[in-house]
């Protein structure tokens, strides 16, 4: 059996196996045991009572976290005319059409979010093999194909997270950084849960939100007592 490192021992001493933690207690404990040389993210995993093999039970969408993610988000926008001016005014890092597409085909993909107006999809459609594997392809279901590109840019910059159930029916996303106030982090998670419940498929039966687990980038996962969350 492999020996535990000092850090693993310290974590094991503080965490009770099988316990469900009140959200703010979990956030504070995870911050305490964080001992890496970079600022870790807080990540959430939410097990949903859906059958991801059925297309009508795939849950996907986007949530603007009220307190942001703590990350600097780079946004590229495909649009033209007044939309281009509005996108730049809203804080977009790069706005263009064919010129932007050429840059991306050439490997310039240093963006976290790509947004497009509907009239720009003729250009964006050429980039499926470039943007798709990186999760950057604009999609109307998560608000990244929209005539209101300015609002989409503001939402992305403010800390919007996009989510989709994986093959096991689990939603994974970052909800903040270690160093966030626990109450602010809780508000972010509650906003996400509220949207997930709004998007519950009509064909989903039984318990919908089955399990909520909070972790840090390099840390353990703690199961959250859902009674400690208001959503």
Swiss-Prot record:
GO cellular component: cytosolic large ribosomal subunit
Keyword presence, tRNA-binding: yes
Keyword Cytoplasm in annotation: no
A GO biological process held by the record: regulation of translation
General function of this protein: Binds directly to 23S rRNA. The L1 stalk is quite mobile in the ribosome, and is involved in E site tRNA release.
Similarity remark: Belongs to the universal ribosomal protein uL1 family.
Subunit structure: Part of the 50S ribosomal subunit.
PANTHER family named in the record: 54S RIBOSOMAL PROTEIN L1, MITOCHONDRIAL, LARGE RIBOSOMAL SUBUNIT PROTEIN UL1M
This protein's name: Large ribosomal subunit protein uL1
Organism: Stutzerimonas stutzeri (strain A1501) (Pseudomonas stutzeri)
């Amino acid at each position: 059996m492999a020996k535990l490192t000092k850090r693993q021992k310290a974590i094991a001493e503080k965490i009770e196996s099988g316990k469900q933690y009140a959200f703010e207690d979990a956030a504070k404990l995870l911050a305490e045991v964080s001992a890496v040389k970079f600022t870790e993210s807080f990540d959430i995993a939410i097990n949903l009572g859906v059958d991801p093999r059925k297309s009508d039970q795939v849950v996907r969408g986007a949530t603007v976290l009220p307190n942001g993610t703590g990350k600097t988000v780079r946004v590229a926008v495909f649009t033209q005319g007044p939309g281009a001016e509005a996108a730049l005014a809203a804080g977009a890092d790069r706005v263009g059409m064919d010129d932007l597409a050429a840059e991306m085909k050439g490997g310039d993909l240093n963006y976290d979010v790509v947004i497009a107006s509907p009239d720009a999809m003729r250009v964006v459609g050429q980039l499926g093999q470039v943007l798709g594997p990186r999760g950057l392809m604009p999609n109307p279901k998560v608000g990244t194909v929209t005539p209101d590109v300015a609002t989409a840019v503001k939402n992305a910059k403010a800390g919007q997270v996009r989510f989709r159930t994986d093959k096991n029916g689990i939603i994974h996303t970052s909800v903040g950084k270690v160093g966030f106030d626990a109450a602010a982090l809780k508000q972010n998670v509650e906003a996400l849960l509220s949207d997930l419940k709004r998007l519950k498929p009509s064909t989903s039966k039984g318990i919908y939100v089955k399990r909520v687990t909070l972790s840090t980038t390099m840390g353990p996962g703690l199961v959250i007592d859902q009674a400690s969350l208001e959503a």
